[in-house]
Amino acid sequence: MNNIIEYIESKYTPIAIIVYGSYCDGTNNESSDFDALVISDNHVKFHDLSFVDGVQLDLFIYPKEFFDKPDDFSDFMHIYYSDVVKDTNNYGENLKRNIVKYVDSLPNKTDVELLEGIAWCQKMLKRSKQNDIEGMFRWHWLLTESLSIFCQLKHKQYFGPKLQ
């Protein structure tokens, strides 16, 4: 991981590096990529998919200004479980704290909304039985969306398949 951090530091001059995913929770293996949010003073928004030492990067680079007045952290919920590995003036820790606060403040679904989610799953299951491309599409959509609906039924946020 040290070579990856050195690469990030030399290329983006980050003020914060926030690592999430398998390299954060210690479950990384030979097929893992390296997930990180990188905040930079001097770089535009960019998605870096380079390789370092055979590890594919999945770096989301953002200029600091992007987070100056955020009103919605929904695209950054995956940072909830993360490690700030480089930080200047507590910028990364403050950003993570704001994201955690945002996620923790999200309301649970109402009983009506939960029932709607179940009904949607039942409808998709029925429609997925079509023996055509639309049926296959609906089957895969059901498989992915039902994970989120299941977590909603348990009054939890869905952060991905590894974080439950």
How would you describe each model-predicted region?
Residues 1-3, 49, 71-73, 84-92, ...:
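Proteins with a high burden of low-complexity, intrinsically disordered sequence enriched in S/T/G/P/A and R
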Residues 48-133:
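Conserved NTP/Mg2+-binding pocket subregion across the NTase superfamily
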Residues 109-164:
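Conserved nucleotidyltransferase catalytic core and NTase-mimicking acidic/glycine-rich helix/loop elements
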